[in-house]
Amino acid sequence: MIPAVRPSGFLPPGIHPALWTEFEQHYDHTPRRHELLAGLAAALAELRAAGCSQIFVGGSFLTPKPDPNDIDCCFDYAHDLDWPRLAAADLLSTANDCAAQRARYGCEFHFANMAIDQFGPIQATITFLEFYQRNADGEPVGVVVLALGSLS
């Protein structure tokens, strides 16, 4: 279940599981969000077909912001994923701030366990999953995990 946002506008810290239908109902409340969710659904279908079982969603899409720029996502790296399929779907291309992903899906995808060095106010090496669990001020926030088996 997706918890209510805190007064800061962010989810409470933690990893909050949700089904796709709940996620869609919770966040689909403006035309821009609807557009982004359609792109996310297309990307998730590709990820699921490539063998990915879950993704983590973070960033401003999880806040009350009516028109977020994109949806920030990360997924678990696994050796048995269908790498050619992921590449063909632009889900491995992080060049130019994930330009191909943003153009095709309105989303950014990274490996959850990939390290980021000294990113923003967080002066340490952290993973994308850890990064998504901090706001721009470095304070803890929540993320949503979607099981891809819950897609309709």
What positions do the PLM features span?
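Short hydrophobic/aromatic beta-strand micro-patches
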Residues: 74-76
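Acidic active-site catalytic centers that drive phospho-/nucleotidyl reactions
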Residues: 70-72
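Catalytic core of pol beta-like nucleotidyltransferases
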Residues: 1-54, 62-68, 78-152
